[in-house]
């Protein structure tokens, strides 16, 4: 693989996807400290919201330590070169949330839908483009449909005004060939000025190989997270990925030592538990389950006595998707009843 001379934009997720691993409990001081460190390390894009995006604060998804407005108000004014992005999932976030983010200085909005539901993004993408925002169509759980079906959904988002389309491996299920076929098709069939991005999770240990495959096939925006802080086994660990890109002579603009120090000195000390591939996060990738389901399944194990990995495997069989967090408890309860009946 020869990537020498290619240029990529790295986008940090530790303060948004990392919210899942922290049960949305990141303090304002932690948020500002990490964002400032990322800014000084040269990270050009930093995502800041509730783990489930703007408006995510709810009983279903979890209540954060602070509101999106408070996080954005604290972070945006401190940035010297980095731009701040926000995630918005239609049905959770609204156009009013989008306007709030714009008013608070967000430069990039990423409108995220399940990979088959791009049509629900039209209002939000159109509104973002009218505001002059860098507007990304973010197709989640992209492993669940064929490359051709993904392209059709991407074309919808592009037609609404998205200037960048993401292939999103929300479950950490994909292997490099899965990424290559999808990214190659998107690159060849979307408008040449439309950027292509990839968002990976490390549940099968494939986040770096998958991200490299995406770059090889034409993606120029790659998501990652310092120290991998994110849902499941985390996102592509940015400090590791930066070192790999250095080795491959890819242009990325990040100071390796500084990003290593942010990971080691700021992010790792605030982790509630190590971000690693354990039996439960591995099951997420193996079964193709939405990565943010991990902590929900582990809580259900304590509540119902059913192993989390068995719950996750069943959720994979049921083809659950993001937004169906309520099914985790229902599934665990049903499995517990079946186990009890089998023992009777």
Swiss-Prot record:
Keywords: Aromatic hydrocarbons catabolism, Lyase, Manganese, Metal-binding. It catalyses: (S)-4-hydroxy-2-oxopentanoate = acetaldehyde + pyruvate. It comes from Pseudoalteromonas translucida (strain TAC 125). Mn(2+) binds at residues 17, 199, 201. Coiled coil: none annotated. Residues 8-260 form the Pyruvate carboxyltransferase domain. Pfam families: DmpG_comm, HMGL-like. The gene is mhpE. Substrate binds at residues 16-17, 170, 199, 290. Disulfide bonds: none annotated. Belongs to the 4-hydroxy-2-oxovalerate aldolase family. The keyword Manganese applies. Its EC number is 4.1.3.39. The keyword Metal-binding applies. GO terms for biological process: catabolic process; L-leucine biosynthetic process. GO terms for molecular function: 2-isopropylmalate synthase activity; 4-hydroxy-2-oxovalerate aldolase activity; manganese ion binding. The record marks 16 as: Transition state stabilizer. This is 4-hydroxy-2-oxovalerate aldolase. The active site is at residue 20.
